[in-house]
Amino acid sequence: KLANHLAGSLYDMLPADPKTVNPAGEWNTIVIRVKDGKVTHTQNGKKVVEYTLWSKEWDDMVANSKFKDFQGFQEGISHEGYIGLQDHGYPIWFRNIKIRELK
């Protein structure tokens, strides 16, 4: 398994560090905060990934990922829209999903 494909990571771009994922059978708590383009992933209370959307860093990560040819990534991530929840064919459960606007 690739490190940037595991829980808490920015999929195929940045691995979660430190690795704070709980073992199978235990719930993980993930918070993804986006404010003015700055994104932070927190997993089980620890910051594991940080990056800035709409930046050269972001464009470079996309160019070196599997998303380089995906519509919407090279043109730039939109400032509002949809979210996606992802799995890879294994059993998965979600609970207490909350989305709120930061003011």
Please tell me what each predicted stretch does.
Residues 1-103:
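Carbohydrate-interacting regions of secretory-pathway proteins
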